[in-house]
């Protein structure tokens, strides 16, 4: 009996890791500086309107065997803060890509720019992967150069909404999860940094060719529909036609000084504990094409 009580006490005092870790405070919360925008004021349905539903402040997208769905911002931006709170589907979601991203692929087919947050589906018992990516004048053809960094998360993204955001300014791109910076991509030269205006997109689609274990596990439509929910949209920055004096929101307390020491500590924590793939460390990649590494 005494041993049983000790064991139970340890379970209470030392909960298992995985989806229960608490992130360190970044000390600065960019999302709190940007007001929430109604979906209809900022976005339009791009495709799959029959697979999109709006209820109060929640936009639901779903994928089945017939199609997925996507939306696009009404205006292009040349810099800014772009975020949304997203809740993912539990269970078997292999092959499914749920995304929030910036792109100008419709305006520059064949050499577009793109900045991605993608949730790559999984199988029961395994965590989602959050993939961040940056394309510069890449088209999705054989010449495309991806800059992927993949993470697991310190919480279960299927249990509640969490806020994910991209902050893009003339000097750097910062990816945030609940205001914790998880990745920075700095402008070292114009050739490897997106500078042309981009639109904001969200979508759910079948990426079976590559999304889960490099395409080994495909989407299984016995588990359809695959559902993603979005709310708390936050868009603020400089549109393509803003004056040259426009300044986007700052990723840190001190504008133009980079992330604070506390934010860098939070970023280091996230990468040390949850980074599972870094293109710069992949020996199979041709790093002459990624000089930033």
Swiss-Prot record:
Free-text disruption phenotype from the record: Reduced growth, decreased cell wall xyloglucan content and increased aluminum resistance. No visible phenotype under normal growth conditions.
UniProt domain GH16: residue ranges: 29-230
Modification comment: Contains at least one intrachain disulfide bond essential for its enzymatic activity.
GO biological process: cell wall biogenesis; cell wall macromolecule catabolic process; cell wall organization; xyloglucan metabolic process
Disulfide bonds: 238-246, 280-293
Signal peptide: 1-20
Cell location: Secreted, Cell wall; Secreted, Extracellular space, Apoplast; Cell membrane
Active site: 114 (nucleophile), 118 (proton donor)
Expression by tissue: Predominantly expressed in root. Weakly expressed in influorescence stems. Expressed in root tips and elongation zones, stems, young leaves, flowers and siliques. Expressed in root, hypocotyl, and etiolated whole seedlings.
EC number: 2.4.1.207, 3.2.1.151
Induction entry: Up-regulated by gibberellins. Not induced by auxin. Down-regulated by aluminum.
Annotated PROSITE patterns: GH16_2
Marked site (Important for catalytic activity) residue numbers: 116
Source species, domain of life: Eukaryota
One of the record's GO molecular function terms: polysaccharide binding
Assigned GO CC terms: apoplast; plasma membrane
Catalytic activity reported: breaks a beta-(1->4) bond in the backbone of a xyloglucan and transfers the xyloglucanyl segment on to O-4 of the non-reducing terminal glucose residue of an acceptor, which can be a xyloglucan or an oligosaccharide of xyloglucan; xyloglucan + H2O = xyloglucan oligosaccharides
Effect of pH on activity: Optimum pH is 5 for the XET activity. Optimum pH is 4.5 - 4.75 for the XEH activity.
Binding-site positions, xyloglucan: 118, 131-133, 141-148, 209-210, 285
Keywords (A to Z) from UniProt: Apoplast, Cell membrane, Cell wall, Cell wall biogenesis/degradation, Disulfide bond, Glycosidase, Hydrolase, Membrane, Secreted, Signal, Transferase
Note: In contrast to group 1 and group 2 endotransglucosylase/hydrolase proteins, it may not contain the ligase activity, and may catalyze endohydrolysis xyloglucan polymers only.
Subunit details: Interacts with XTH17. The formation of an XTH17-XTH31 dimer may be required for XET activity.
Entry's family note: Belongs to the glycosyl hydrolase 16 family. XTH group 3 subfamily.
Function of the protein: Catalyzes xyloglucan endohydrolysis (XEH) and/or endotransglycosylation (XET). Cleaves and religates xyloglucan polymers, an essential constituent of the primary cell wall, and thereby participates in cell wall construction of growing tissues. Involved in the accumulation of hemicelluloses. Has a high XEH activity and only a slight XET activity in vitro, but the main in planta activity seems to be XET, thus controlling aluminum sensitivity. Acceptor preferences are XXXGol = XXFGol > XXLGol > XLLGol = XLFGol.
Protein name, as recorded: Xyloglucan endotransglucosylase/hydrolase protein 31
Species, as recorded: Arabidopsis thaliana (Mouse-ear cress)
